[in-house]
Amino acid sequence: MPQLNPAPWFMIFMFTWAIFLTILPPKVMAHTFPNEPSPQGMTTPKTAPWNWPWH
Amino acid sequence: MTLSLFDQFSSPSFLGIPMILMALALPWLLIPTPTSRWLSNRVVSLQGWFIARFTNQLFLPLNVGGHKWAPLLASLMMFLLTLNMLGLMPYIFTPTTQLSLNLGLAVPLWLATVLIGMRNQPTHALGHFLPEGTPTALIPILIIIETISLFIRPLALGVRLTANLTAGHLLIHLISSAVFVLMPMMPAVAILTAVLLLLLTMLEVAVAMIQAYVFILLLSLYLQENV
């Protein structure tokens, strides 16, 4: 099984953690949520249609 | 040289450059970083909702001290989920089939949970070695068994992900080869095998998502025991 060849193991280990620690957390943490979590039991407001584009 | 079925898993290199660096660095183009706009687009909104709901669900059973792991486990979920799902497409290398990657993630994270438990609440952490209500005569053997099961955890975590993905890719390879070989000889059997391949591919999509989730879930359980 070629996965058991230990030659690239250290490089893969280092690079995985480098990507996992530098690229991903900024992407995940950049998501912001504008509203506070609301308690359940509130009536859902009726939504009005909007005429401006999605983005 | 003739290729064996396992050669699809050898860490690819081109002109001496290991291609796994590409496989690890490029998928994040599919996860756009949200800007400071109040109104985001569909992709960003969906990813944000997924991350928020997932992290909420995952951290419900954890004490507040463990909540500082939220960014790490959310990032790890996106990491594994993206790599697993992308690898299902033809000719795309799946880095999570590499035992080095999975053990490299599992061992440090498991060790972190164990060290946190041993440092902050050593009595409580060591108490996991002896379940309540054990008959006195069984205590020595049970402590040995619990110790072994503790140390097996990172190995199981890494090997579970590796084996599931490797086996899935191997099966897809085998069955698709069978479809091609059977097509000129027995077209009816080839069509049945193609239906089987379709079902298997749907299973592999599910396995890709579930195995990523199981990895994270087990890490959160190990954290729950220790924090």
UniProtKB/Swiss-Prot annotation, chain A:
Membrane spanning residue stretches: 4-24
This protein's record includes keyword DNA-binding: no
One Gene Ontology term from the biological process aspect of the record: proton motive force-driven ATP synthesis
GO molecular function: proton transmembrane transporter activity
Self-association state and partner proteins as the record states: Component of the ATP synthase complex composed at least of ATP5F1A/subunit alpha, ATP5F1B/subunit beta, ATP5MC1/subunit c (homooctomer), MT-ATP6/subunit a, MT-ATP8/subunit 8, ATP5ME/subunit e, ATP5MF/subunit f, ATP5MG/subunit g, ATP5MK/subunit k, ATP5MJ/subunit j, ATP5F1C/subunit gamma, ATP5F1D/subunit delta, ATP5F1E/subunit epsilon, ATP5PF/subunit F6, ATP5PB/subunit b, ATP5PD/subunit d, ATP5PO/subunit OSCP.
General function of this protein: Subunit 8, of the mitochondrial membrane ATP synthase complex (F(1)F(0) ATP synthase or Complex V) that produces ATP from ADP in the presence of a proton gradient across the membrane which is generated by electron transport complexes of the respiratory chain. ATP synthase complex consist of a soluble F(1) head domain - the catalytic core - and a membrane F(1) domain - the membrane proton channel. These two domains are linked by a central stalk rotating inside the F(1) region and a stationary peripheral stalk.
InterPro entries, sorted: ATP8_metazoa, ATPase_protein_8
Membrane-topology descriptor: Single-pass membrane protein
Family, as annotated: Belongs to the ATPase protein 8 family.
Primary site of residence: mitochondrion
Localisation per UniProt entry: Mitochondrion membrane
UniProt keyword terms in alphabetical order: ATP synthesis, CF(0), Hydrogen ion transport, Ion transport, Membrane, Mitochondrion, Transmembrane, Transmembrane helix, Transport
Protein name: ATP synthase F(0) complex subunit 8
Region (Disordered): 34-55
GO CC annotation: mitochondrial membrane; proton-transporting ATP synthase complex
